[in-house]
A protein has these predicted regions:
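A conserved beta-strand/loop element that lines the FAD pocket in flavoprotein oxidoreductases
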Residues: 1-6
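Flavin-dependent oxidoreductases
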Residues: 8-160, 174, 180-183
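C-terminal catalytic lobe of FAD-dependent flavoproteins
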Residues: 139, 143-148, 157-257
């Protein structure tokens, strides 16, 4: 919504971007910072950057893979009381992550859901609607250029959580904490979740391209990346960050994964 970026204007004697093309006109610039989450692919394509990555394996050989892979991030809310997870000290708990190899049975039907490794996370919903969380995402089985990112999230007609997610996540909650047993019917049905645009190794890329374009491809780690803004700003001004250095694009060809 608002101004739409349609492309980039480049200098005649260099690869540097001199302007950002939008549906409202061209915005001249000296530096460009792209931090677009699931839309990283679109800006990458506009900048005409490579659609594949060459990765040096442990065997010393080069392997070619797609630059991007879309994952469907499955999330939901179970409508328990806002203080359902309150700790003994009266405070709300942190985000809880659980990975398990124990067989998982349905809280509703008691049938086996999976006997393979599974994982969930959950926390109090920030809007007080209950407990919010999700399971492991699944890979979208399409070439990244054929994935419809828009309309995004709850507006997407194609990418939504399913009844199978509902049963699995609520059952996993009951498996982890007895207080969730018999609460599956409180799951708030409705559109949720969204697409994530993943790099070849599912770790972020923080790097400069085309001389003056700084790409923050956070691999949809979201709020966990909230501290990078200051580090990126310092890099643009000439101070390299030791924290961001391992996440350069050339790590793939170097095999430094």
């Amino acid at each position: 919504k608002g101004v739409t970026v349609t492309g980039f204007k480049k200098g005649s004697n260099s690869k540097a971007v001199t302007g950002v093309e939008t549906d409202k006109g061209v915005i001249d610039c000296e530096q460009v910072v792209v931090g677009a989450g699931p839309w990283a692919r679109d800006f990458w394509n506009m900048l005409e950057l490579p659609k594949t990555a060459n990765i040096k394996g442990k065997d010393g050989k080069m392997h070619t893979t797609d630059m991007w892979t879309y994952w469907m991030l499955q999330e939901g809310v179970i409508g328990v009381e806002p203080d359902f997870l309150k700790m003994d000290n009266g405070k709300q708990p942190p985000v809880i992550h659980v990975d398990s190899t124990a067989p998982l049975y349905s809280d509703k039907t008691k049938k086996l859901i999976t006997d393979k490794i599974w994982g969930i996370y959950y926390k109090p919903d920030i809007e007080g609607l209950g407990v919010q969380g999700g399971t492991s995402p699944y890979i979208v089985d399409k070439h990244f250029d054929k994935v419809n990112v828009d309309p995004y999230g709850i507006d997407s007609p194609e990418f939504q959580t399913t009844e199978a997610f509902n049963d699995m996540w609520c059952s996993a909650l009951a498996h982890c904490q007895k207080r969730f047993e018999g609460k599956s019917d409180l799951y708030r049905k409705g559109p949720s979740g969204g697409l994530g645009c993943m790099t070849p190794d599912s770790f972020p890329i923080f790097d400069r391209f085309l001389e003056n374009v700084y790409m923050i491809a956070d691999a949809n780690h979201g709020y966990k990346m909230i501290g990078v803004g200051e580090l990126v700003a310092k890099e643009i001004l000439g101070t390299e960050s030791d924290l961001l250095k391992p996440f350069r694009f050339n790590r793939y060809e170097k095999g430094e994964l």
